[in-house]
């Protein structure tokens, strides 16, 4: 991974969880979620990422990885969340 990619991932993680922010909880520590694309669910590149806390990313029944349909209905599509994330970085 090149330095610009690492820097981008760091900045995204520093934003805090985008799902928590939509619920009114700001500055929740986040990890990186690579948005998936295509029928095979391939991970995207290191610039197509959104910040999610472990709860919303992978550990709860409300997480993207365990309940993607529920998560999408509640918070929006991965593409919509990516667009918001990129706006936050401006």
What are these regions (language model features)?
Residues 12, 34, 53:
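Divalent metal-coordination and catalytic microenvironments
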Residues 28, 48-49:
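Conserved catalytic motifs of the protein kinase core domain
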Residues 22, 35, 40-42:
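The feature represents the first ordered module of a protein
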Residues 27-35, 61-66:
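Short Cys/His-rich "knuckle" micro-motifs
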Residues 21, 54-57:
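Cys/His-coordinated zinc-binding microdomains
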Residues 39-48, 58-90:
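Polybasic, low-complexity binding patches
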Residues 2-31:
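Short cysteine-rich loop/turn motifs with clustered Cys
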